[in-house]
Amino acid sequence: MREDYRNKRAVVIGASMGGLLAARALADYYGEVTVVERDALPDGYEPRKGVPQGRHTHGLLARGREVLEQLFPGFTDEMVAQGATAGDIVDKVLWFNHGFYLHNSPSNLHGLAISRPMLEGSVRRRLLQLPNIRLCERCAVLEPTFDRAQGRVTGVRVQSQGGSDGAQVMNADFVVDASGRGSSSPAWLDAWGYPKPREELIKIGLGYVTRQYRRLPEHLRGMSGAIIAACPPDWRFGVMLSQEGDRWIVTVGGYLGDHAPTDDSGFVDFARSLQKPEIFDVVRAAEPLCPLMPYQFNANLRRHYQELSRFPAGFFGVWRRLVQLQSCLRSGDDRCLHGIAGFAGMPGGRHARNCRTLLSGSEPAHRYSLANCRRQRSSTPACRRRAHDPGTLHQLVHRKILSRRPG
């Protein structure tokens, strides 16, 4: 720990994945890191009210798993010992995208199939083993305290739920907002006299339904998952991943209002309608383990904080405060971990400069779409052939999603 930070305190608003990982990064710098969470947190691996997406499909791609392993050494082996599935995401997962199957072959890109409650609960448990981490649950942050003369956030006003005491001030040298989509950061910034960031909204009309099933060895030819992507003009998709406890978690849905039904027969019929049959072949006969769980997400929203020339000192927003993305296709926690890997090296710096660093790789995805290569007038026959070549896809995934090459 740096000597000049030893006597300083950081406060993190929110104990979801973004908040837990931000706290872990800050623990290497600050003498005390306090995580403030409004929910009562479960002792085990249970879904909770503040994470409604936690009942749906989650997992870690290779880069996300690597960063988590760096933050918490031995994490992967610990999760596998408890039933999670680690494996080569190219060799052991069936991918169907834009009319082609990705050829399964070893890639040395190892992901982790794990439920969101188990992932979050395990990260929280490991985090609390650090001596300078403190958790304050069932405690709501009313607002950060702000010194207008210095242009600096100096702490947070908190209210304990169910307690008789009034609001109290928790002083801090650095405050991180990781409170999720419902954060009041835009309103706080406006009240402090800072400009609102430009917002970029893309309506997607996404809706999906999830159910868990009993997993048998003969399912999916022994593979650990299947992803059937939406390929326009067919906007329907399906995701099936192995989970701890010999379970499958299956999510089917669609974009632009083409949502999966929430009754048993409708759910199975929707799975039958997907472009490939692997998910349907499992759900039509497997034993359901829970009710059908719907989720809707209307739009992706990005706030361009990196464009602001002024921002309060001692204040930072991570994860969904910057980019709100739908989470059912596994990339959400990986983007969070990728951002934390960059954030870990620069607490205390200016927010706008840090945002420019963290978001420098957030170019529109269509620029890197292999299907786009096939559609371009200027594409050559060689380019079109390579558009579904696994080697080309490996390069795309390594460079723009997983941030590493195999080997």
Enumerate the predicted regions with their spans.
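Short beta-strand to alpha-helix junction loop
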Residues: 59-60, 106-125, 178, 184, ...
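Helix-loop-beta segment of a Rossmann-like dinucleotide-binding subdomain
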Residues: 97-116, 153-155, 252-255
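FAD/FMN-dependent oxidoreductases across multiple families
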Residues: 113, 208, 258-369
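Predominantly flavin-linked oxidoreductase catalytic cores and closely associated redox partners
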Residues: 129-276
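C-terminal helical "tail/cap" subdomain of flavin- and related membrane-associated enzymes
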Residues: 344-407
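Residues in the short beta-alpha loop(s) of Rossmann-like NAD(P)-binding domains
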Residues: 39
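N-terminal Rossmann-like FAD-binding beta1-loop-alpha1 element of flavoenzymes
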Residues: 3-36
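N-terminal FAD cofactor-binding segment of flavoenzymes
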Residues: 25, 29, 45-94
